[in-house]
């Protein structure tokens, strides 16, 4: 089995650029399609051969309403084993700009827990309403 996730946001082009920059991802040209208005119908963002996240334009205007009704998102993107503190710091610098909720306002920290024990990381809800949990 292979699982993957897609986020629906207003501003799919900007969101995809943000995630590409934060996590050093590249779009899969075979898994990229555009809407008539030039926004993404779908774009798979890859780290090597692994899809990390797909992005699509929220054409139904549901996303912000769902966020407004829920205090926290019902799902989080967990990116672990990012490798270095520098990679985590870079992801934080990019994703924390205009974050809606920043659970780590002082930046990445240790201890930050995952299934393997203490790591260096952060948690936040980005400007598009996507929750990220990222660590070394």
Predicted regions and their residues:
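Vicinal oxygen chelate
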Residues: 1-10, 17-127, 134-136
């Amino acid at each position: 089995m292979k699982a993957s996730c897609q986020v629906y946001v207003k501003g799919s082009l900007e969101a995809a650029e943000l995630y590409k920059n934060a996590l050093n991802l590249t779009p899969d040209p075979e898994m990229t399609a555009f809407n008539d208005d030039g926004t993404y119908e779908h774009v798979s963002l890859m780290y090597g051969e692994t899809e990390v996240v797909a992005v699509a334009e929220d054409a139904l205007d549901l996303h912000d309403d769902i966020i407004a009704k829920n205090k926290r998102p019902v799902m989080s993107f967990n990116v672990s084993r990012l490798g270095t503190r520098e990679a985590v710091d870079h992801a934080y610098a990019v994703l924390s700009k205009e974050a809606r909720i920043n659970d780590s306002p002082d930046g990445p920290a240790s201890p930050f827990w995952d299934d393997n024990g203490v790591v260096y990381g952060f948690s936040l809800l980005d400007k598009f309403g996507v929750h990220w949990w990222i660590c070394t």
